[in-house]
Amino acid sequence: MEGPSSSSVPTASDAPSKYLLPSDSDDGIATSSAANVGARNHVTNTEKMEKEKKPSPMVLNVDPDYDYDEEDGGSCEEDQRGPPAPISREIVDGAIARRSRDRQISPGVKMSIGNYDDMEDDDEEAETPEEQKQRFLASMKRIRNQPQEAFDPPEDTEAMREFINRQVNDAMMFNRDNHIDYSPVNKPKEAKIIEGYLWGGIIGTGSYGKVKEVIDIYTITRRAAKIMKYEKLRKIPNGWDNIRSEMSILRRLNHRNIVKLIEVFNLPEKGKVYMIFEYCIGSVQNLIDMEPAHRLSIGESHAIFLELCHGLNYLHSKRVSHKDIKPGNLLLSIDMTVKICDFGVAEQICLFQSDGRCTKVNGTPKFQPPECVYGNHEYFDGYKVDMWSAGVTLYNMVSGKYPFEQQVLLRLYESIGTNPVEMPTNVELSKDLQDIIKRLLDKDFNTRPNISDVMQHPWFQTGFPEDQGLGRIMERMRTGDRPFTMYPSLQAMYDGAGSEVILDEDGNELVLPPPDLVKRGLKFFLELKILENLPGTLSLSSFPGFQTLEKRPGDGPPPSSDSGVVAAPDSASGDPLRRPSSRSMPTSAPPRPPSGAVEVVEAVAAPEAVVEDPVVEEAPAQQQEAPDRRRRGKRSLFSCIFRSRTDSS
């Protein structure tokens, strides 16, 4: 029961009629003068104390249902500070009425001391259960939507584990039974399958990401997957735009000298984009790096340049400018077919343009033309940019050098724009080869030849054995080991799977091809021991026993010889050695050999350095017909089946 106490003390004359004192009996109220005098003195003292202290109004809550019982430990004795404040009948009745109303609104007993007005405000502001529920839901939603910082978990390295084990063992020296011996658990490799592709090892890296070898588990076809992360694409200027442009261009191209785009898919939960291409074993740059002389033979360079021009002719017919032709972007398929790749900076020329005018400069500095790096033109021809890059690529393949080389980038640009082209001195180049290089490296793009002019050049139309897939190219195809990184994944899928069901990352069961064929193939290759240590890309170990172009002291232009034999003094023994090459030894355009050429070769060459050919006696007749294709007779069925890649007849 709640109610405000009186703020002022009544007079002595009103006290007998309005107040009930605890000492009053039920029969009546004492009216003696002594009592009145005592009450009057008490009231006077109380008024003085209240005037001095001036306390705030007090609220005395009294419960009418409370049954006082002295046995419970209660006491009604007067307070030590003075008699209790008197209570009137009106105050008690009002408190009882308010208590009844409070019970109807909110049942329960509540006792408090404070201002009555404040209590009413608290009752008015009290939240209903529905409001409390809404406030709780709002707070939970705010906590759930609060951004949280992502911290990378600490790397559990071998050194960290050893340190922890050492500390634990030192702390438990008193009990040898608790000693911990750490031995790493060799978990079996699990087959990684994403979007129907079994993933192998890395076969290449680049500025946009890395390339891995994969196998289509439904067709057992080797593919190459280019993996690009969202974060790296955002950091590269125009990274996303270049990727979208590459996808749109490759989807419209279909040529044997252009790498084929198989599929593109995106995994937002991993933050990666995947581009699936046809598989290639390496690049022209790998072939150059494998040679100790860092160059290729003239015949190999001609065969590669031949297919490069066919690919550029197709691109330019589709109004596409690659703008980044270089040996690293010329891939080699398993049959040594050249395929142009990396269309990240390629540009689609507008259909309504009469020329290949471009304004956006991209590419590798050493392969860029003067109009792009020297800054003396407002625009440039995208088709002529590809021809300049093709000329630098040809120069690099035949000599192992670049036409313009400087250590500082600005000096390189200045050299490209001002210095004349100098022919390499470490190799002997024919006049036709020098002429086509000079024309391709013409600093004026208006007079620089286009792809049609290059394909009509005499050196381009010259025949080489390498053009027919012979020579060193055929030797690589016949004796080389193909890069293969899928053996651990295949072994984990078929040999380690057992009777368990293989699931992809989404938990779906994979329908695999019959494993018996794959198991027999794996068993065969495992017995031969040729799949375990193969690298991901072409290297010197890919072609065991292959004779490369060795770099000699003072590697200068070799003397010409009708038989194709290069006699060079050896640094150790001084004996003449035949230039290392293939069985047919194509080092230049094969001239018409005179009679008795074979006997001269056998007499001059050292027996231990010569690669014997069992059919060398038939070589003059074959070489005699090789340069002139128009004199061939009617071809048989087998000739049509095994015809060369460059022969369209």
From Swiss-Prot:
InterPro entries in alphabetical order: Kinase-like_dom_sf (IPR011009), LKB1_c (IPR039154), Prot_kinase_dom (IPR000719), Protein_kinase_ATP_BS (IPR017441), Ser/Thr_kinase_AS (IPR008271)
Coiled-coil annotated spans: none
Record flagged with keyword Phosphoprotein: no
Biased composition (Acidic residues): 64-77, 117-129
Catalytic function, reaction form: L-seryl-[protein] + ATP = O-phospho-L-seryl-[protein] + ADP + H(+); L-threonyl-[protein] + ATP = O-phospho-L-threonyl-[protein] + ADP + H(+)
Biased composition (Basic and acidic residues): 45-55
SUPFAM superfamilies per record: Protein kinase-like (PK-like) (SSF56112)
Cofactor: Mg(2+); Mn(2+)
Top-level taxon: Eukaryota
Annotated EC: 2.7.11.1
GO biological process, any: glucose homeostasis
Positions of the UniProt region annotated as Disordered: 1-132, 548-649
Location in the cell: Cytoplasm, Cell cortex
SMART domains per record: S_TKc (SM00220)
Keywords: ATP-binding, Cytoplasm, Developmental protein, Kinase, Magnesium, Manganese, Metal-binding, Nucleotide-binding, Serine/threonine-protein kinase, Stress response, Transferase
Residues annotated as domain Protein kinase: 197-460
Polar residues bias spans: 1-11
Gene Ontology MF: a single term: ATP binding
CDD domains hit by this protein: STKc_LKB1
Protein residues bound to ATP: I203, G204, T205, G206, S207, Y208, G209, K210, V211, K226
Gene Ontology CC: cell cortex; centrosome; cytoplasm; kinetochore; nucleus; spindle pole
Family statement: Belongs to the protein kinase superfamily. CAMK Ser/Thr protein kinase family. LKB1 subfamily.
The protein's role, per its UniProt record: Required for cytoplasmic partitioning and asymmetric cell division in early embryogenesis. Phosphorylates and restricts the asymmetry effectors mex-5 and mex-6 to the anterior cytoplasm of the zygote and maintains these phosphorylations until fertilization. Phosphorylates and regulates aak-2 in response to oxidative stress. May also play a role in motility, behavioral response, regulation of lifespan and dauer formation through this pathway.
Name of the protein described by the UniProt record: Serine/threonine-protein kinase par-4
Gene name of the encoded protein: par-4
